[in-house]
């Protein structure tokens, strides 16, 4: 492992890995080697967390999993179960905040789209107990459909945003952010990115705070967002903006450091600050404005602009700050960044990007001694989705223009060889509603493929639409009894999918369950063929446990 990599993740060259995350929790100044996700989780526990609500999604999953496995969370009975989707998670956390307790919501960036209704309106109701919404963004789309930037949501909702530059800061910020939320009676957004979430560094922990006692809001009427109340709450939120800005300009997390060379001033947001300083062991020669708390500290930006010839904006994600600065500064100052090409417009920010943007010579890179064998994405050997797709493909060859609308999950890999089985993947739950829309347009056969966890996340409402109109679609709920793609978390509908579908209104005789195995291929094909020919809504449930969780359960039984 190279020294450069060790510096990237925040580990000194000679410092040993420090284990014992689960040691006695009352020790102050203890040290742990933590992922960014784990630093957020431990910081929340130590800050008096009473409940975490989340739906699994890379790169946020490990936050909740860490809390689920931590002894202090069990001792304090911190709520730590998975939610059905991000909207229900957001609303449940808001309910806990209503009762004066500290709550946290965790999701990946696209989960913010699902939670948006509750999220934006939580800024209107305000909070009682501290409420932190953690959004883990995925620049470069390592495991996502897009690289949207959650800072836009913070600005849209007019609430403060925190963006840690290191794992230590991620830990420290949790207590600070909970205090901030309670002081201003407003939810706050904590924005992570993949490299922060999934890299490790040594974190020094602090004092462990007790959870809040239960208490009702002092002004419960503020939580009833009828127009007469909402208008007043909106005025209050707008009035708070000046306070949020003043806090950001005086925040310990926003720091202006002068330099000897004023030909360039660098604004580094979140993890970009870590990347920047990696290249300057003896300090950066240019003035640097570190930004980790929003609203954008305008006074600090203007201070830098007044003394520097050119500004370079470094941020991982969309050019959020770069666009803001162009609006703040109207003096013709040259501003460089993603919008002008010095930093690539797409993809995650890297230390190499920063070297190029600064015009510095990169360190010599030695080629690897061995090439790693390529591991392209593929369904696991023995996966039930394989047998499901094999059967679907064989039946659909009998039709001239079949279309299969798929969803978010392991089964998305059915797009790749050797199956090439699906024609669309857009967002959670879209398979059923897109199949319905295609059928409305005259498409036959119109097939939806969705997983059990995604179905309960956001597929049930689409099924209700289809039932209400008796749409001519066939829905395959490929049930592997878990949330497989994110590591095998519990699925809300396990063991109840038939009852759910029947309760929504699907005719019981057209809810078919089959075990997807090669020996059952003829049975599967016959069922698929029969339900495609049925004129109406039909549901096929190929059910077999995820091969990975099955192996894990088998090992546990042997122990």
Feature locations, PLM:
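Short helix/loop capping segments that flank catalytic or ligand/cofactor-binding pockets
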Residues: 115, 142-144, 198-201, 274-278, ...
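Short helix-loop-beta junction
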Residues: 68-73, 277-288, 499-507
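Flexible, low-complexity linker and terminal segments
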Residues: 12-37, 47, 164-379, 384-385, ...
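Thiamine diphosphate
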Residues: 18-167, 195, 259, 285, 415-539, 547-554, ...
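Short beta-strand segments
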Residues: 106-107, 132-136, 189-193, 267-268, ...
